[in-house]
Amino acid sequence: MSLRTVLVDDERLARLELRRLLAVHPQVEIIGEAANGDDALALINAQQPDLAFLDVRMPGMD
């Protein structure tokens, strides 16, 4: 069983690094990414992930 996961961070390099770190865990399936709070809410509502990695400080919405 995989953990359907979303990554949310306004810094592209942070998302890339997190994706790299999670790649060694076959049970983690990254189903989407968002770069801001509004997109994150839409993504989470649409995809209903099991797990979300969230940046706590982002422009517009924290």
Protein language model regions, located:
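Active-site beta3 strand of CheY-like receiver
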Residues: Q47-F53
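Helix N-cap/capping motif at the beta->alpha junctions
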Residues: E33-A42
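Receiver (REC) domain active-site loop signature in two-component systems and cognate sites
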Residues: M58
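Two-component/phosphorelay signaling modules centered on CheY-like receiver
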Residues: L3, R12-G32
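Active-site residues of response regulator receiver
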Residues: D9, D55
